[in-house]
Curated annotation (Swiss-Prot):
Binds 1 [4Fe-4S] cluster per subunit. Keywords: 4Fe-4S, Amino-acid biosynthesis, Branched-chain amino acid biosynthesis, Iron, Iron-sulfur, Leucine biosynthesis, Lyase, Metal-binding. Belongs to the aconitase/IPM isomerase family. LeuC type 1 subfamily. This is 3-isopropylmalate dehydratase large subunit. Its cofactor is [4Fe-4S] cluster. Its EC number is 4.2.1.33. One of its GO terms (molecular function) is 4 iron, 4 sulfur cluster binding. It catalyses: (2R,3S)-3-isopropylmalate = (2S)-2-isopropylmalate. Pathway: Amino-acid biosynthesis; L-leucine biosynthesis; L-leucine from 3-methyl-2-oxobutanoate: step 2/4.
Length: 466
């Protein structure tokens, strides 16, 4: 029977499947951080249980850490409790921890792949909604709740219902300057923020195949923003080249065996998907969100939509509510929208390729008057590489702030947050009301678009001179 990539990985991980119960699947890698793990560790202690597979559990600190200082004294009281609790729990249960002083510390969905923890054909879970990022390697990766975190810790398994399958094909090749972020925002704009609900999405087509691993991670990272359980890209030579030699990747004879196994991780030609979506890559322009969810997106040469043009009453009301919150008027040219904050970072766009793209638009320029712009590398390794290439100097000379790794301004959980009324060009993944701070307004863009907005003081079409 022909199978999709998802079905192949799923079937190889089903431990037991009983009638009337969700199947029990095996988990290969469990990633944890300081925010969603304390209750799970406490549950193990109360029940007197050990960690089932500490060697398959990896911890880091990212959500509530400071990007200005690696000192515990820089943390808020609650953040310090979370960080110190994770330290204690990892020591007690024998979990490998990349703490704020470790050179490889970083955002969990950045450091996992770059250390080779993420591998094709594996099942990966984390108490974080953007775990789908790891699907870029042909892994089945998804976020779980705290009670599920405890279940995985105790059993290395999880009960899950099998999802439906969706193929999203991006045909042809994108124009110069169009990035993975533009591709995924265009996809969400087409199918909506709930278009993938109930599905595991496989991204394919020439435009996807042409992406680097960093780009594929950006696309899969935002699968959750279209409602999908997970996103996947079939592994290929680009995947293997990225993983070769990384710390936790197979070595020697095991590497050759892995390459052979990964070659089978592709959807069979006659496999049938439950749903299919097609986009033409050549139609994709630089994208940015105008509203309060990732599906409210438009091309840079487009206009803020007019709710009066919408016949669906529910959609019309949603547009009206969003426009009121973001303080934009229907018909406004997106290039006329000014910003006063810029955030380049997050598990969506904080890898070395992202910083290189942003630096191209910052080099030799200055951040516009009245604009505050920060660049937050996704990990210690990304920061080290960027500094070796001189990217930090480019940003600093242009007036950007260069920070330590962490989730930072993606969410208003740590000290990096917006004030009410701030309008931010952000490379993160969510633009919900208050996501970056109470009363703040977020526009999701690529790193290149964010850097260009920082120096112009407003959104610009990076395909043109500005």
């Amino acid at each position: 029977m022909a199978k999709t990539l998802y079905e192949k990985v799923w079937d190889s991980h089903v431990v037991v499947e009983n009638e009337g119960q969700a199947p029990l699947i095996y988990v290969d890698r469990h990633l944890v951080h300081e925010v969603t793990s304390p209750q799970a560790f406490s549950g193990l202690k109360v029940a007197g249980r050990k960690l089932r597979a500490p060697e398959k559990t990896f911890a880091t600190m990212d959500h509530n850490t400071s990007t200005k200082s690696a000192s515990l004294d820089a943390l808020s009281p609650m953040a310090r409790i979370q960080v110190e609790t994770l330290q204690d729990n990892c020591k007690e249960f024998g979990v490998r921890l990349y703490d704020i002083h470790h050179k490889n510390q970083g955002i969990v969905h950045v450091m996992g792949p770059e250390l080779g923890i993420t591998l094709p054909g594996t099942v990966i879970v984390c108490g974080d909604s953007h775990t789908a990022t790891h699907g870029a390697f042909g892994a089945l990766a998804f976020g779980i709740g705290t009670s599920e975190v405890e279940h995985v810790m105790a059993t290395q398994t999880l009960r899950q219902n099998k999802a439906k399958t969706m193929k999203i094909e991006v045909r042809g090749h994108v124009a110069a300057g169009i990035t993975a972020k533009d591709i995924v925002l265009a996809i969400i704009g087409k199918i909506g923020m709930d278009g993938g609900t109930g599905y595991v999405v496989e991204f394919c087509g020439e435009a996807i195949e042409a992406l680097s691993m960093e780009g594929r991670m950006t696309v899969c990272n935002m699968a959750i923003e279209m409602g999908a359980k997970a996103g996947m890209v079939a592994p290929d030579g680009i995947t293997a080249e990225y993983l070769k030699g990384r710390e936790f990747a197979p070595k020697g004879e095991s590497w050759e065996q892995a390459i052979a196994a990964w070659a089978e991780l592709k959807t069979d030609e006659d496999a049938i998907f439950d749903a299919s979506v097609v986009l033409e890559a050549s139609d994709i322009a630089p994208q940015l969100t105008w509203g309060t969810n990732p599906g409210q997106v438009v091309a840079i040469d487009g206009l803020v939509p007019n709710p009066e043009d919408e016949s669906n009453a529910t959609v019309k009301a949603s547009i009206e509510k969003a426009l009121e919150y973001v303080a934009l008027s229907a018909g406004t040219c997106m290039t006329d929208v000014s910003i006063n904050k810029v955030f380049i970072g997050s598990c969506t766009n904080s890898r070395i390729e992202d910083l290189r793209d942003a630096a191209l638009h910052a080099k030799g320029r200055k951040v516009a008057a009245g604009v505050t712009a920060i660049v937050v590398p996704g990990s210690g390794l990304v920061k080290e590489q960027a500094e070796a290439e001189g990217l930090d100097k480019i940003f600093l000379e242009a007036g950007f702030e260069w920070r330590l790794p962490g989730c930072s301004m993606c969410l208003a959980m740590n000290d990096d947050r917006l004030e009410a009324g701030d309008r931010c060009a952000s490379t993160s993944n969510r633009n919900f009301e208050g996501r970056q701070g109470r009363g703040s307004r977020t526009h999701l863009v690529s790193p290149a678009m964010a850097a260009a907005a920082a120096v112009a003081g407003h959104f610009v079409d990076i395909r043109k001179a500005y």
